[in-house]
């Protein structure tokens, strides 16, 4: 339980940031899901578009501190690998 006014404010700020981060993480997952759906459909063009939309979105989340940069790099790398396998 927060006892001081500054601690109470910190609790409020954490709750607000949690909501923002949750929304940003959800947005990244949505873009990833769109890529997966395009990949499952076998449509290379739509998969490339979905990948190009996904990459800046996850990097934006990295810059906001939602994901670690290595986590984002790993996800982008794995999706790029799957996209390349589709074209081969």
Swiss-Prot record:
The keyword Nucleus does not apply. GO terms for molecular function: small ribosomal subunit rRNA binding; structural constituent of ribosome. The gene is rpsT. Transmembrane segments: none annotated. It comes from Bartonella tribocorum (strain CIP 105476 / IBS 506). This is Small ribosomal subunit protein bS20. Belongs to the bacterial ribosomal protein bS20 family. GO terms for cellular component: small ribosomal subunit. It comes from the Bacteria. GO terms for biological process: translation. Binds directly to 16S ribosomal RNA. The keyword Ribosomal protein applies. InterPro entries: Ribosomal_bS20, Ribosomal_bS20_sf. Keywords: Ribonucleoprotein, Ribosomal protein, RNA-binding, rRNA-binding.
């Amino acid at each position: 339980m927060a006892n001081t006014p500054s601690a109470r404010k910190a609790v409020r700020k954490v709750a607000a940031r949690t909501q923002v981060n949750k929304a940003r993480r959800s947005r990244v997952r949505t873009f990833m899901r769109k890529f997966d759906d395009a990949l499952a459909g076998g449509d290379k063009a739509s998969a490339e578009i979905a990948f190009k939309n996904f990459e800046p979105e996850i990097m934006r989340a990295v810059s906001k501190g939602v994901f670690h940069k290595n986590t984002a790099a790993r996800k982008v790398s794995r999706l790029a690998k799957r996209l390349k396998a589709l074209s081969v």
